[in-house]
Curated annotation (Swiss-Prot):
One of its GO terms (biological process) is tRNA threonylcarbamoyladenosine modification. Keywords: ATP-binding, Cytoplasm, Nucleotide-binding, Nucleotidyltransferase, Transferase, tRNA processing. This is Threonylcarbamoyl-AMP synthase. Residues 7-190 form the YrdC-like domain. Signal peptide: none annotated. SUPFAM superfamilies: YrdC/RibB. It catalyses: L-threonine + hydrogencarbonate + ATP = L-threonylcarbamoyladenylate + diphosphate + H2O. One of its GO terms (molecular function) is ATP binding. Its EC number is 2.7.7.87. Pfam families: Sua5_yciO_yrdC. It is found in: Cytoplasm.
């Protein structure tokens, strides 16, 4: 399936994000729901939708490492750690970095760290580039339901009027692997 968004669809998604609302979009394995990481209003809407406590923290998904720099502190990374991370990106591996002190608690939760990923999904890259920043990203599913893998499944769980960027997932069966950026410790198998 062609994942190149027509400019009208990108413009609509960006408008929804700018209005502090949540959108759904395909990622490497499943559909995600996301919003503007700098909007507490939008993040609280997402957390309420997912019935997820703010203390758990969230993941940011980005088109490039540059988009993530305002949120994370990569100064403690050695050259070999940096090389290990960049060898996985862009791709379906999420790394937990120390957060910058100014990174909002609505993103980090009870942690002093933040999980981030540079995606290789062309549609998400285009969306993040058009919006000019990363998106909060978590699986598109209601509590107790399986993650959505199609636009139809998103509409079945969230309603027909829920804003969805239509497209195909990347075909992976498992969600992204999650690792500690400093130690390489595996938190979740991908």
């Amino acid at each position: 399936m062609n994942n190149n968004l027509p400019s009208e669809a990108v413009a609509h998604a960006v408008a929804v994000l700018k209005n502090e609302h949540v959108i759904a979009y395909p990622t490497e394995a499943v559909f995600g729901v996301g919003c503007d990481p700098d909007s507490e209003t939008a993040v609280m809407r997402l957390l309420e939708l997912k019935q997820r406590p703010v203390e758990k923290g969230l993941i940011l998904i980005a088109a490039s490492f540059e988009q993530l720099k305002p949120y994370i502190d990569d100064s403690r990374l050695s050259d070999s750690q940096r090389e290990a991370i960049f060898s996985c990106w862009p791709g379906p591996v999420t790394f937990v970095f120390p957060a910058r002190p100014e990174t909002p608690r609505w993103l980090t939760g009870r942690f002093d760290s933040l999980a981030v990923r540079v995606t290789n999904h062309p549609l998400v890259i285009e969306l993040c580039e058009a919006y000019g920043k990363p998106l909060v990203s978590t699986s598109a599913n209601l509590t107790g339901q399986p993650p959505c893998r199609t636009t139809a499944e998103v509409h079945a769980q969230f309603g027909d009027s829920f804003p969805v960027v239509d497209g195909a997932t990347g075909g992976r069966q498992n969600p992204s692997e999650i690792r500690d950026a400093l130690t390489g410790e595996l938190f979740r198998q991908g």
